[in-house]
């Protein structure tokens, strides 16, 4: 086996590890609210989320093409080598693990984009390594999606409460209905997460195959689709309980109506972004929806201090992942790896 082939499969292995941490890290997006309101038992919620992550990743790419993968691949201004991709993935993985340990719902999407930027700048020995116009488009979608989630969540719960008040539904019956609906919306969030987030790993794997000369152009192979989908589902099943605690209990005390509203509005925003090819952070969108739903009812219902810590983690993710990837690239090339 040639050195390039070895580097390729090591890079694919690292991409699989990133995909696993993505699923592991982002389990909370889909199921935290369902668990906190007792709509789903923890293990049932995790199994449901894993299954729909798998379905979302495969179905979306099969029927709507890998639009998000193409957007991610456009970050670099040059044909990336394997060491660049390896360093980018390692930077993203490190940041995912750091924020998981701290219990912060940071963004795997931000981390990967930051990793690509850091490794690209290191490889090009300057800022020319990044296609800044493409990066600006990605960052714009990442920045505006949480406020959209917040606004849509606030508007939806306000309208829902008006309907409930108008028709004077019984609280016991309502809670039972909303708990049932939360199972459906948890599946919808999971489907949307798989559809958007698995494509980021597909992009990294396909870039590696192009760099190694195994693919003539950027086109996601079928085996990459299934490997990415299965891995993110497996990572989801492993679950990230620290972050589930933050989203499900620490930001806002949820009831079935607010939990269902946050899930439904978050999933809708994510799915819309996926269909137009924009990479968004499922973590940010769902967190924005949770905060919007809570704030619309009572500003003091939201624990804004926890929200501020989460926002701080969002802001530093891209630069921190970029720095880690830059250092990793320097270490790998100093060790004699090229490609």
Regions found by a protein language model. Name each.
Residues 1-339:
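Multi-pass alpha-helical transmembrane bundle typical of ion/small-solute transporters
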């Amino acid at each position: 086996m040639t050195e390039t082939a070895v580097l390729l499969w090591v890079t694919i292995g690292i991409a699989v590890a990133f995909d696993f941490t993505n699923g592991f890290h982002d389990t909370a997006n889909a199921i935290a609210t369902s668990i906190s309101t007792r709509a789903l038992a923890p293990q049932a919620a995790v199994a449901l989320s894993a299954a729909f992550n798998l379905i979302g990743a495969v179905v979306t790419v099969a029927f709507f093409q890998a639009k998000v993968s193409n957007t991610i691949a456009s970050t670099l201004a040059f044909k990336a080598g394997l060491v660049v991709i390896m360093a980018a993935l390692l930077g993203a993985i490190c940041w995912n693990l750091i924020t998981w340990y701290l219990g912060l719902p940071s963004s795997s999407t931000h981390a990967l984009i930051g990793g690509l930027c850091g490794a690209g700048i290191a490889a090009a020995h300057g800022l020319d390594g990044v296609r800044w116009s493409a990066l600006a488009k990605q960052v714009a979608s990442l920045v505006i999606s949480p406020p959209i989630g917040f606004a849509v969540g606030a508007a939806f719960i306000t309208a829902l409460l008006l309907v409930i008040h108008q028709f004077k539904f019984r609280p016991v019956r309502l809670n039972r209905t909303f708990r049932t609906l939360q199972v459906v919306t948890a599946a919808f969030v999971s489907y949307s997460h798989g559809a958007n987030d698995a494509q980021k790993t597909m992009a990294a794997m396909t870039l590696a195959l192009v760099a190694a000369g195994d693919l003539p152009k950027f086109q996601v192979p079928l085996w990459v689709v299934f490997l990415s989908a299965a891995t993110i589902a497996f990572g989801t099943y492993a679950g990230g309980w620290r972050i589930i605690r933050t989203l499900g209990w620490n930001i806002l005390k949820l009831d079935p109506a607010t939990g269902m509203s946050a899930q439904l509005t978050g999933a809708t925003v994510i799915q819309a972004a996926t269909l137009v090819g924009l990479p968004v952070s499922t973590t940010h969108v769902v967190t924005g929806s949770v905060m919007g739903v809570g704030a619309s009812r009572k500003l003091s219902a939201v624990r804004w201090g926890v929200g501020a810590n989460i926002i701080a983690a969002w802001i530093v993710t891209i630069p921190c992942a970029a720095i880690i990837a830059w250092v990793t690239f320097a270490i790998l090339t100093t060790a004699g790896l090229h490609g």
